[in-house]
């Protein structure tokens, strides 16, 4: 409030906050407001601040709230996987911690930890991931002796880097170290010697990479931006220089210990992504989103382990994840969305739903080594977002996709046909 009675305030209008100025003040009679005469009797009558505040400043000290821990329950490849998330953030977000852990009845473990340090101009971050997977395999030795294999895979990754803002965009420079290891425990049932046991452990992948990424996002901020973006575009590029050692075989040393034989698979990997959002002028919040992706690997003869995979949820969703692969990739994605409801407050148990949309999706693209062959898919999408337990963002997405093109692949001398069946996807996350 200025000396001459003008009021400067913020007002929320058309999906954004704006600064407004009230030139004249009109007093409203208490009878029209609806409050009793003693409504303000308990408020402290503090005088307005009209003099310079001479309080002495002091250096800010980090302040942390208590660690937040939230249990979780996942259904992962047919098994229940209970676990928890933990997080804590400094009051003004100068430092944050986030991690999680889960395990299932097969002793498959998922652990991750993310640390962000934001005291300097660049954000310094560190990430680590630790995963194990257990499986079994049965076979016959010389067609007579049954062999039971207990197989365990362990995946470890460390990543550290800097995030640098630059004229509205963001550079991300990082170094990644990862290695994968396998453990095999065999049991052979024989008539002569009973049960024979043997085991082995070996690394099958070791890799270093230097990563540089750039992203630029000018998508308009609206109340339903996450569920139904309507205006603006985003661009991102990623360049990885990778030094990869991938297992080619196993051998024995002079002392009889197991040795891995690695083959170099060094490469440069480049990717570019773009998204454009547009709101149709004749209907409110009817939107079209266009997405493109292109990728290239410098070594066209690299092992398929390092290929782009363009099926499943991150790619053409009418096909399984491993169905489409290659050293080159291209994808076009068009989504048309209409709102079911907007800015509502529907309560259901511990959840509050605010926005919902229906969408139609068309996808086309391929990942290839020698020849490009178009794969297409049509899908429908339903989205719902809001909050759980009054505080936690909740985003629910259900999709069904039908492939339009059939093709065959030969894997282990077996022909597999893709494109005959549709696929459904359900996601429940904090955001879309």
What function would you assign to each model-found segment?
Residues 194-227, 314-323, 329-332:
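Outer-membrane beta-barrel transmembrane domain signature of Gram-negative proteins
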Residues 7-10:
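Residue position within the beta-strands of beta-propeller blades
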Residues 81, 85-87, 96-136, 141-149, ...:
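C-terminal transmembrane beta-barrel domains of outer membrane proteins
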Residues 2-4:
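Residue-level detector of Asp-centered blade-edge/turn motifs that repeat once per structural unit
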Residues 149-189:
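Transmembrane beta-barrel wall of Gram-negative outer-membrane proteins
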Residues 17-18, 23-128, 213-216, 220-230, ...:
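Outer-membrane beta-barrel initiation region
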Residues 166-169, 203-205, 225-230, 283:
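Edge/loop elements at the starts and ends of beta-strands within beta-rich repeat scaffolds
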